[in-house]
Design a protein with these regions (language model features):
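Intrinsically disordered, metal-sensing/regulatory segments
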Residues: 1-183
């Protein structure tokens, strides 16, 4: 179940990109599209983080505080990474600031919405919160591996990483989840 939650976050991002999320093609003239694609991916990841915070706070104050601190500890590095990436691909400063503001707002807005939606329900239990965090991690892994890392490591901007390797990795996670493990 844990591996499936991680895999689902990854596959949802793959599906979003396949069905219309701006797809970066890693050419110099497509730097705006690449920046937008990475930003939208990180906004989706941050919204999933906000979902986890809102659900955990509606479940218990202690769990909510732990999840909030854990998520807040990586927001700074995530924002730094996004701003560094946008600078690396030469996105104009005003557009980069707008992307960072949208990224910064996505977690708190989703946390507030989730809190009020779940505060009197039975969904907000620790097991579901853990699954939500793993889903969020899957979205982040997608953005990092499919959009950001290929651009940072490519010297030739006309080569996309083959989708077959991405799908193979997703299948391996699924397979290991099916096989399980013993203690």
């Amino acid at each position: 179940t844990l591996g499936l939650a991680l895999l689902m976050g990854f596959l949802v991002m793959l599906l979003l990109e396949t069905l219309g999320l701006p797809h970066a093609v890693h050419h110099d003239e497509d730097k705006d599209l690449l920046g937008l694609s990475a930003t939208i991916g990180l906004i989706a990841h941050a919204a999933a983080d906000g979902l986890a915070v809102g659900a955990s706070v509606s479940s218990s104050t202690e769990t909510g505080l732990i999840v909030f601190v854990a998520i807040m500890l990586h927001k700074g590095p995530a924002a730094f990474g996004l701003s560094s990436f946008l600078k690396h691909i030469d996105i104009e400063e005003s557009k980069a600031k707008m992307y960072l503001i949208l990224f910064a707002l996505s977690s708190p807005l989703m946390a507030i919405i989730t809190f009020f939606a779940l505060k009197d329900t039975s969904f907000a239990i620790d097991d579901n919160i853990a699954l939500t965090l793993l889903f969020s991690a899957g979205t982040f892994i997608y953005v990092a591996t499919v959009d950001v890392l290929p651009e940072l490591h490519s010297h030739e901007h006309d080569n996309d990483a083959p989708i077959s390797f991405v799908l193979l990795g997703a299948f391996l996670v699924f397979l290991t989840t099916l096989l399980g493990h013993s203690h």
